[in-house]
């Protein structure tokens, strides 16, 4: 009788000691799909033709970091244990502002740079061993962005208020996140750095343009925070 009574009291403790494992075979599926949405913050790295020490303000171009959004689909192809190939096509939207404080006219000092990227990344995802219902991971890869707002075909340039950029940009990416396994789906918050490989600048027609004359190139850099459901 004492043993039965002791067993009754121990059962709840044993149940707590053995957590329920959600989606136990999820990581062994050959292919998984889902969707994501999130926010981004982007700015430009600005490279100059030459540092003009006789007139320092000419190199003092300021990039105002701004916030936008990301949305897209995910496909995950299992390669081996802990390693998968991910395809995450989507849309990235952002509106940045370049400021040229050395220009005197107020209408000349600021230029908006719209970015509406059709975003096509291919990434490798390496995950740690799963701990109960969560698993940390890292990602690395490359992507291409097709900017629908590049103004590259416009004949107008900064002299008429249009800052032009290249329509196709290649990036490299590094990131990390945590997979959480719920009873019905895998939920993943992640952070990813995005860095352009290509110069996105299209120079103005005038080689001595105060907006682009001393610029060697501009390169997107930013951070994306996504919530993924698979």
Outline where the language-model segments fall.
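Bacterial Sec-dependent N-terminal signal peptides
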Residues: 1-23, 227-230
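Hydrophobic alpha-helical transmembrane segments of integral membrane proteins
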Residues: 8-9, 117-120, 185
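Short glycine/proline- and aromatic-enriched beta-strand/turn motifs that initiate or cap beta-hairpins
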Residues: 17-67, 230
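Gram-negative (and chloroplast) outer-membrane scaffold detector with strong preference
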Residues: 27-31, 39-45, 74-151, 226, ...
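Residues that define the transmembrane beta-barrel architecture of outer-membrane proteins
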Residues: 29-31, 65-69, 114-118, 134, ...
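Flexible, solvent-exposed loop segments that connect beta-strands
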Residues: 47-62, 94-115, 148-166, 201-216
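Predominantly the C-terminal beta-signal and adjacent terminal strand-loop region
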Residues: 167-169, 177-230
